[in-house]
Amino acid sequence: MDFAPDPEVVVSEHADADCLPIFDAQGHPTATVQRQFANGEAINFVLKRAGQPISACFTYRNYESVWEIGGVWSDPQSRRSGFARRVVSSALATLAQQNRIPRYQVHEANLPSIQLAEALGLTRFVTMEHFLYESPTPSLR
């Protein structure tokens, strides 16, 4: 599938100040995200209405030429309107233009995000299981 940047999605190599709290709330700490942008290892994608984000994501260098698409978000009142598809498609197009390998990680319970990935033609290639050792020693827990 060929992806094209959406003309309404603002693509920037600088973190959008309106997006930082959104990404932070999703587990991407602001200081880490700002450092990724400062190092030239992140790209911001945002779709706005009336000057406010309605959907956003960012990409960041994960390993060598592999770039993660993360922080995918849409305003709760605007969900199921295709906005996330537009920002993620723009991210995929941008990474393709830069000869970077996109990776889209999603939690197994996030069905809307899984459906978005599948609708975009992405295929599942790694499924991870995590195991935890619970030490009987309290100081090692």
Give short role names for the model-derived ranges.
Residues 18, 64, 111-112:
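Short alpha-helical
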Residues 113-115, 136-137:
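Short Asp/Glu-rich motifs
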Residues 74, 80-97, 114-119:
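Conserved acetyl-CoA-binding loop-helix of GNAT-fold acetyltransferases
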Residues 2-31:
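Short amphipathic alpha-helix that is part of the acyltransferase structural core
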Residues 95-107:
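Conserved GNAT acetyl-CoA-binding A-motif
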Residues 123-139:
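Conserved catalytic-core motifs of GNAT/GCN5-like acyltransferases
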Residues 31-75:
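A conserved beta-strand-loop-helix scaffold within acyl/acetyltransferase catalytic domains
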Residues 1-2, 93, 98, 141:
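Intrinsically disordered, low-complexity, positively biased terminal segments
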